[in-house]
């Protein structure tokens, strides 16, 4: 009986700690993110802007989506210049398949991106973190002799003192060369 009581108390304590941590994250000031310093943010931006994606393409479905999420998170930082937003946008487009790229020109994409970033900044919003589903939950399918993989990502977005989530499902398509890595990205 005492053993069961200890387990129940331990579970209750862990649940209270989880709720308290969520409350802490949801109510801390937006300009002080405990998970990231300004130096880390600047080095991340430098890395993302200068990375040679074409020669060093991510090897797995999860890595492609993770790189795209890191680029997206960097867009919405308040101190990112318009020049760096354009560089990040070009980096993100490298991850898009040709079909997705052809839906809008690079200039149209960058214009829409800047408009979206402006809305986020006006709402005092930024992506504080993201979470990609595990590789075990990635769904692989074949359609018209092409291989596809679907994976989900959740962005945690801070607007002022509020924390909300935004889910995105990505479908990646294996390229025609038949290489092991997936080289195309399409967001739903």
Provide a role label for each language-model segment.
Residues 138, 167-174:
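Hydrophobic/aromatic beta-strand elements that line small-molecule binding cavities or substrate pockets
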Residues 162-165:
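Short glycine/proline-enriched turns and hinge-like loops at secondary-structure junctions
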Residues 1-46:
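Amphipathic, hydrophobic N-terminal targeting peptides for secretion and organelle import
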Residues 183-188:
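Conserved small/polar residues in nucleotide/adenosyl-binding loops
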Residues 43-122:
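Core segments of small alpha/beta cavity-forming domains
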Residues 177-182:
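Tryptophan-centered short beta-strand motifs
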Residues 144, 174-176:
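A generic beta-sheet turn/junction motif
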